[in-house]
């Protein structure tokens, strides 16, 4: 697996797959005029290709997750203020979570993008302060973890729950089947 994300590792373990995890080093900068869909798919493919070069006989799973609201790509918070800015934007609104998934093997590379719409309740400054104090928002796209404390802020989603966690399992299995790595 081309990821050091504990959440992605936990999700893959649910499938009963044996795997090793490697963190690829790639440039995650957004390219000029790049859509969120193109961005997450490009990063997933770059991550997979980077690790496949090191382990050419392996099957590599890679993913990247970002949010989009008002046409803007929202990644991980860089500071407390950045997290608060993100939450202020998400507060009381719907946003979309996109994951690019790539499964790469020596004979084939397949990828796709999955979208889930997430509704956030209106957050007070006290909500934001308390949530920040938990440490949970760090390292998470959109500065929240749907599988954790932030679940209390999300009344509904439309689409794949595991996509919002960071690895849409249904689509991952479909890609593994395409490279004949899953029955």
Curated annotation (Swiss-Prot):
Its cofactor is a divalent metal cation. It catalyses: dTTP + H2O = dTMP + diphosphate + H(+); UTP + H2O = UMP + diphosphate + H(+). The active site is at residue 64. One of its GO terms (molecular function) is UTP diphosphatase activity. It is an enzyme of class 3 (hydrolase). Its EC number is 3.6.1.9. The record marks 7, 65, 147 as: Important for substrate specificity. Gene3D superfamilies: 3.90.950.10. InterPro entries: ITPase-like_fam, Maf-like. GO terms for cellular component: cytoplasm. Its main location: cytoplasm. It is found in: Cytoplasm. GO terms for biological process: nucleotide metabolic process. Keywords: Cytoplasm, Hydrolase, Nucleotide metabolism. Nucleoside triphosphate pyrophosphatase that hydrolyzes dTTP and UTP. May have a dual role in cell division arrest and in preventing the incorporation of modified nucleotides into cellular nucleic acids. HAMAP family: Maf (MF_00528). Belongs to the Maf family. YhdE subfamily. This is dTTP/UTP pyrophosphatase.
């Amino acid at each position: 697996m081309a990821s050091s994300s504990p959440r992605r590792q936990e999700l893959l373990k649910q499938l009963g797959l044996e795997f090793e995890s490697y963190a690829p080093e790639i440039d995650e900068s957004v390219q000029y005029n790049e859509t969120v869909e193109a961005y997450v798919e490009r990063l997933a493919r770059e991550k997979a290709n980077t690790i496949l070069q090191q382990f050419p006989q392996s099957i590599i799973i890679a993913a990247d997750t970002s949010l989009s609201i008002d046409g803007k790509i929202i990644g991980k918070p860089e500071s407390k203020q950045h997290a608060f800015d993100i939450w202020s934007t998400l507060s009381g609104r719907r946003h979309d979570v996109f994951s690019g998934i790539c499964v790469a093997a020596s004979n084939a590379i397949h990828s796709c993008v999955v979208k889930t719409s997430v509704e956030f309740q209106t957050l007070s400054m006290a909500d934001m302060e308390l949530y920040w104090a938990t440490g949970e928002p760090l390292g998470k796209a959109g500065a929240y973890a749907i599988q954790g404390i932030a679940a209390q802020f999300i009344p509904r989603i439309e689409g794949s729950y595991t996509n919002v966690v960071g690895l849409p399992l249904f689509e991952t299995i479909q890609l593994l089947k395409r490279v004949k790595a899953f029955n």
